[in-house]
Amino acid sequence: MMTYYILIGAIALISWLVSSRLKSKFNHYSKVHLRNGMSGAEIAEKMLADHGIYDVKVVSTPGMLTDHYNPRNKTVNLSEGVYSQRNAAAAAVAAHECGHAVQHATAYEWLTMRSKLVPVVSVTSSLSMWVVFGGLLLGAGAGLGLGFYIAVAGLIMMGLATLFSFITLPVEYDASNRALAWLRNKNMVSQEEYKGSQDALKWAARTYLVAAIGSLATLVYWGLQVFGGRD
């Protein structure tokens, strides 16, 4: 169990460092003002229009770094700062979220797969740890029947969450690539602004990478606990 706490602690530390770096980057690039004077909302609306998407709304949502695309009601939700500000960070985030809208409109396969997993993972992710732990208490590690099968069921649930986190990676990287390509090809940003947008999105993507690695490490650890004691 101590190994688990050390592992989780290390992953939590790395996650905190990456998140802190991300916030620092966004604060820095928030000071790089766009030469075209467009706000994040205007950037988003133009990118959607340039891709022939007219059934998606751009709305403001409270908080910092709360930006997301909602495929259910087709809305690009931009945090208050991103929605109204006119800088490289806002342009990067707005274009990235619109990248998800473009994925949705073009039936991007990885986004489709992730969307199908959402309702399942939203339920199983909160239960998996308890199911595995319950199975271990019932003797899974010693190879006892009922406890073992309960623990395996928990591992499967945990595995779905891990799968979801890894499917998220190509979705996020592709959205960033679409955003950066559009910003560059449409001359929406200067070279300096483009570099800032690229750097900001790079650090945003790393938060998903750390989360995926953490999920896999947790799955492997508990898998060893369940299967390690069996002959």
Please give the residue ranges for each predicted region:
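Hydrophobic alpha-helical transmembrane segments of small proteolipidic membrane proteins, enriched
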Residues: 1-25, 153-155, 165-169
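Helix-coil boundary and interhelical linker segments in multi-pass alpha-helical membrane proteins
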Residues: 1-4, 137-152, 227-231
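Hydrophobic alpha-helical transmembrane segments of polytopic
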Residues: 7-11, 121-128, 150-157, 161, ...
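Core hydrophobic alpha-helical membrane-spanning segments
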Residues: 7-14, 130-134, 223
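Polar-ligand-bearing catalytic/cofactor-coordination segments
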Residues: 19-124, 163-231
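Short, structured loop/turn "capping" segments at alpha-beta junctions
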Residues: 109-113, 127-131, 144
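Post-HExxH zinc-binding segment in Zn-dependent metallohydrolases
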Residues: 117-140
